[in-house]
Amino acid sequence: MKFGLVSIGSHTGYWLKHEIEKQSEKILLIEPVKHNLDELKENTKNINSITIEECAITDSDQTKPFYYVKHSSISKLKKHWASGIGSFSKKHILDHKSKNFQIEESDIETVEINCLSFKSLVEKYNIHSIDKLIIDVEGAEYKILKSIDYSSIKIDQIIFEKKHFDNTFFEGPKLKEIKNLLLSFNCKIENLDKENILATKNYL
């Protein structure tokens, strides 16, 4: 099955609005946090081509603790993007603390979530090709990108967040490793902006 868009870490769908609007193919949105899921479902309820998967994607099928900013703390922290901070590492969330973002441990919720590997996701939805894969998972991008069998699935473009690749607000050898991996599968690598990378498959 072909998907025009697969988004891992879809949040409420707000930042995907433009991508969703220009799609004519099937869309798969993945999001593990309940209050984000509720908004995501509401925001996309009239689009029949969208399927929403309630889980996290990592390198294996498992159930594990997931940390995110409490819904009740988002307005207190006065940053709209706080609802998008979710991670398998509590430290990653606390490391966002700054003068203007006074997050504390009491602002963090923990929940056991179901995780699928990318391979299991592909098998579940019988995915053979993806026009655009977007990954925004607060530092878990490395495990996902490393686990993909690029020879068995056609992915035209991958957009992924780079700013937390090796640690919170740190880019290092893991990012270099993934860039080299994508280059080995004949992808062109470019900075989309200061936080994200675009990898485009070259079929020539």
Per-region residue spans from a language model:
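Phosphate/nucleotide-binding beta-alpha loop and adjacent structural elements of enzyme active sites
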Residues: 1-204
